């Protein structure tokens, strides 16, 4: 696995657009720092699937003349084409249905082709023929004469598609201009308009394509991701000119797509000036807040430590007032009648907390809680409220502990109910731990600092280790202490084993044996003979060798003790010292039994060694001591 891989949206986020923004059509447009669309969401056939609405529309048109299952079969089944051409139905509407299908399905190899996006060589481009377009035009004109509005509209759409995929793609533009006034404003109309936008895009005439895409964005939610992808950003001056011929809602859509690529803030302000009730600001606001928090929330699992209350607040204030101004969010939340007031109240509460305006944050979040109309929205408010309370703490007191204890167990145990959008809670868990740990360090309380957020090296100090052992075993813990002791990631067994390992590297073997006997890990078998010392230094080779003697962590320590006792008595000091030297070498990072130091507290499982353990895992002090002793004999 790559260490720079995807770590989840909650790695540095607590603001969930999945919860705060209601409409699903905006989901691909949520903020994603790694991909153009949220979740690397491809624009695939499914996102452009109108099959259900098409089947329903034809069913309503054909009535009892053709069952819905048959309609579906003729529209989409590969085996139906031959039957379509051979059928001679008596019903006029069914005849027209088959006539349309004969043209539409005969040309699917051109108009509905799928291809391998990685295959640049074998893709062939074919064009629809004029004869097919003429047949479709005849059917369209016949339907107009008969005043069959449904069929005429369907044939009009087929003509738009055939012209777009012809060698004269631009012909679809003129045809649309000549015929669009007579078309009802259905989804099919906007799907036809989409071909016109595509023709303009092919000409790189974005001043013409963008307004059309805005109309489609406004009317066909399922195409919002597609048209946003096809949109090309232009200057503000150009956009103002283009928007003149659009309705206020369409102008809002134009600015929404532009805000996706440029400034969400500017786009939101333009949209609100046109229509304060426009829903298009929702996904833009969520993107702005997600961008802001990504710069604020740098204290995740692999992020920065929180050095002090003051430093944290200086950082958040700078981001929320300079890098990402937020006055406009607060003003809008207070004064504007927006489409999604819940979203604005949550956003205002969240950014107020970053501005160190904690009481204002409480006010906004209290309003949001009253507006929350489902459990997920209520949980979102509760999460951000908890973050606000933690960020507001200048010092930790029993009163603060009691207040936080109302919500912390809920957050640690939180699981979204089935069918409910999940909160982004991962960062919150880490941030709360780091914040409380920082405050406890300031109070000179190393035990609670370690319990709330563990750091490597804590157990290198004997007095801290002893204090933690005593704390974990005490019976009269407060409810606050009990909560953190249960959540603490290490057990007494982990502590005993880590102490045994640390004692070994200090050559305190008797103590190491006594400690190892307290832990179940005493029986863990080492992957190689730790006393081998071959010129060919190959750990994998050592692991593959048959083992005449299988050493556990405990029996390994006991054997080292036996050899050291022999050295002290002068019993074969050369061989015993050489073997003990091998033991210390093989138990280092470079040796064949690195397994010996695997322990949750020491936490050195990878190919790197953290600085806290360089002195024992990379240091040859003990090995060198015994090799030199062997050399003397």
Regions found by a protein language model. Name each.
Residues 1-144, 149-161, 166-633:
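Extracytoplasmic/secretory-pathway proteins
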